[in-house]
Amino acid sequence: MKAPGSRLQVSATGRAIIALLFVFSVGPILSALPFELAGELDAAGLRQTLARQKGRVVLLNFWATWCVPCREEFPELSKLQGKYGAAGFQLIGVSTDFAKVRPAVQKFLAEQRPSFPNYRKKSGGDDQDFIEAVDSSWGGELPFSVLYDRSGKKVRVYSGSLPLAAAEKEIRKLLAAR
């Protein structure tokens, strides 16, 4: 087969080789980009991140790679984002893993391929200030989720695994309220 406008002939084998080169060189780069951590958050960064979401219903979820319930609910959280994202819902994940295990966090995100941004809680700083920015009742248990309405008002706190059916019902209710 001749390439258009060229005297060069490309065989079926040549086309297959070109396709494989594209898949193995560009494909992995493109597929890895969305699954990087969006950054690190301290209390001020968390407040700013939430403030930027005004007008959207937000579920803020704290997790860690060593937390089995966190790992189990993660795929369901991604489904929630996929299902309600276009309607004005935004899920934001925050890993509480220490900086030294960042490669494990990156690996987990690459495996899970989440449809929502994920941050890591910044190490050091004032942990009490961070807890106050999240919810003063939070004792550090994981998973831990906080649901906000479109105005940024805290509506519900979920300590432990997210009760998916109840949370989804609450999300639908908040999305319907204008």
Predicted regions and their residues:
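Bacterial N-terminal signal peptides
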Residues: A16-P28
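Sec/Tat signal peptide C-region and signal peptidase I cleavage site
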Residues: P28-P34
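A short beta-strand-turn-helix
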Residues: L37-V58, Q81
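Conserved redox-active cysteine motifs that mediate thiol-disulfide chemistry
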Residues: F62-K79
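Structural microenvironment flanking redox-active thiols in thiol-disulfide oxidoreductases
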Residues: F74-R113, G125-E132
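Thiol/disulfide oxidoreductase modules built on the thioredoxin-like
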Residues: Q112-P114, K122-E170
